[in-house]
């Protein structure tokens, strides 16, 4: 068969969706692939609450402003936290936090438990400030230290731009809650400049052995944004990283679009080493909370089946053990839980009292959480792997990988199954 006929056969082949990622891998090998997303599996964890504050992860930082049954004076995010403290006090408090929230021993324990990667969220303000920003800087020193620890303990890293100016989603984990100004003014261009800074430093040869992906932006709220403008941002962000010399994977988060939505975007041959990041949760609506455990597991299994069909390599960049939204401030400071009927006009499903502390979990709930975790692990093994959210939390056990492993709820080793073959893969 001559080359022209071969190319035509490939173009119209029904197996193209599977052959293209392989071609992508071959091209990457020639460019110096530092992670094989086609065959290797990420077993990773997020280091959330470190360089971008999240009240539900470290409520102790915010509790100084809390009163019994009154959160009205509590800052809702890092923007308002630093604004309330002022630059000098915020610098002092956050330096101590950056220095202590994750330490070298955490990385050592991650390796011990069988993890091979970490995803590190960080905000734009760590690299460049807007004139009016109350944020403080100093995070980069600790990010560099984290990369040294990751290298020492053979952990690969995704650097995840978790917050953009104006906020890309209005979530507290973007740094600025209840705002959606990412696509306004010069904010997109400013974000691209930040990505260029990240790419020039962490996409270079010094970090090729440890940084295997740079995420352009975490969880842009696609249903509320101009998706065409977002696609332009992704394209330019990709180009900025490649122009900086980076060969690492360029990660795009799915923007809350259905699986498969990005199949015809950033495709070969013009774009290479692109990975789609999916975040999977089932607790942020009343409809999800009312599902039976069997329904939860069916949904989780379908994530795996759907991921197998996608054009791009894909990874579950966030997921958790949560079957409730009972963790304090999970939905935001000043907001209750849907599960207990205290938020979002949700019906009452039950009291949160017994779900906050793992020691008081009903035995059936403990079993259900284990089943749910195992089903998700099975599903994400059909993809490029996973990053659990989060490595640790002060009081939110359903989101605390270290605590779940210690309690025997999360499989250890990860292939250990009490409920095998729930998905039938």
Curated annotation (Swiss-Prot):
Gene3D superfamilies: Glycosidases
Gene Ontology MF, one: glucan exo-1,3-beta-glucosidase activity
GO terms (BP aspect): cell wall organization; glucan catabolic process
Disulfide bonds: 301-423, 326-352
Subcellular location: Secreted
EC number(s) recorded for this UniProt protein: 3.2.1.58
Keyword Disulfide bond: yes
Signal sequence segment: 1-19
Catalytic activity: Successive hydrolysis of beta-D-glucose units from the non-reducing ends of (1->3)-beta-D-glucans, releasing alpha-glucose
Catalytic residues (UniProt): 219 (proton donor), 318 (nucleophile)
Main location: secreted
An example Gene Ontology CC term for this record: cell surface
Key words of the record: Cell wall biogenesis/degradation, Disulfide bond, Glycosidase, Hydrolase, Secreted, Signal, Zymogen
Lineage top rank: taxon: Eukaryota
Keyword rRNA processing tagged: no
Function noted in UniProt: Beta-glucanases participate in the metabolism of beta-glucan, the main structural component of the cell wall. It could also function biosynthetically as a transglycosylase.
Family the entry assigns: Belongs to the glycosyl hydrolase 5 (cellulase A) family.
PANTHER family with a match to the protein in the record: GLUCAN 1,3-BETA-GLUCOSIDASE I_II-RELATED, GLUCAN ENDO-1,6-BETA-GLUCOSIDASE B
Name this protein carries in UniProt: Glucan 1,3-beta-glucosidase
């Amino acid at each position: 068969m001559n080359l022209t006929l071969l190319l035509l056969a490939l173009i119209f082949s029904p197996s193209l969706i599977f052959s293209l990622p392989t071609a992508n891998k071959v091209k990457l090998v020639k460019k110096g692939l530092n992670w094989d997303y086609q065959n290797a599996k990420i077993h990773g964890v997020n280091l959330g609450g470190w360089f971008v504050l999240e009240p539900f992860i470290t409520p102790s930082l915010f509790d100084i402003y809390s009163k019994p049954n009154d959160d009205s004076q509590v800052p809702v995010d890092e923007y308002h936290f630093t604004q309330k403290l002022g630059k000098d006090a915020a610098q002092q408090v956050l330096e101590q936090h950056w220095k202590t929230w994750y330490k070298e021993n955490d990385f050592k324990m991650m390796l011990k438990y069988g993890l091979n990667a970490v995803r590190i969220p960080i905000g734009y303000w760590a690299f460049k400030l807007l004139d009016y920003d109350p944020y403080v800087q100093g995070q980069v020193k600790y990010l560099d230290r984290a990369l040294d620890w990751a290298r020492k303990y053979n952990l690969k890293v995704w650097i995840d731009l978790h917050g953009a100016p104006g906020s890309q989603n209005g979530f507290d984990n973007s740094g600025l809650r209840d705002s959606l100004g990412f696509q306004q003014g010069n904010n997109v261009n400013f974000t691209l400049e930040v990505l260029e800074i990240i790419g020039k430093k962490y996409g270079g040869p010094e970090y090729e052995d440890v940084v295997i992906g740079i995420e352009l932006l975490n969880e842009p709220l696609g249903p509320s944004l101009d998706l065409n403008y977002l696609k332009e941002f992704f394209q330019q962000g990709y180009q900025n990283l490649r122009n900086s010399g980076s060969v690492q994977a360029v990660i795009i988060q799915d923007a809350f679009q259905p699986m498969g939505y990005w199949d015809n975007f950033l495709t070969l041959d013009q774009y290479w080493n692109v990975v789609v990041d999916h975040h999977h949760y089932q607790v942020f609506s009343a409809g999800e909370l009312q599902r039976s455990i069997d329904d939860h597991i069916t949904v989780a299994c379908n994530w795996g089946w759907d991921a197998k069909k996608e054009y791009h390599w894909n990874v579950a960049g966030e997921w958790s053990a949560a079957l409730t939204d009972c963790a304090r401030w999970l939905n935001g400071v000043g907001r209750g839980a849907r599960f207990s009927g205290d938020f979002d006009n949700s019906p009452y499903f039950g009291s949160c009292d017994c779900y906050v502390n793992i020691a008081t979990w009903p035995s059936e709930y403990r079993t259900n959480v284990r089943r749910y975790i195992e089903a998700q692990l099975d599903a994400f093994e059909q993809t490029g792997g996973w990053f659990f959210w989060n490595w640790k939390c002060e009081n939110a056990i359903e989101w605390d990988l270290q605590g779940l492993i210690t309690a025997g709820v999360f499989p250890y080793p990860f292939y250990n199954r009490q409920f095998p073959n729930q998905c039938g893969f």
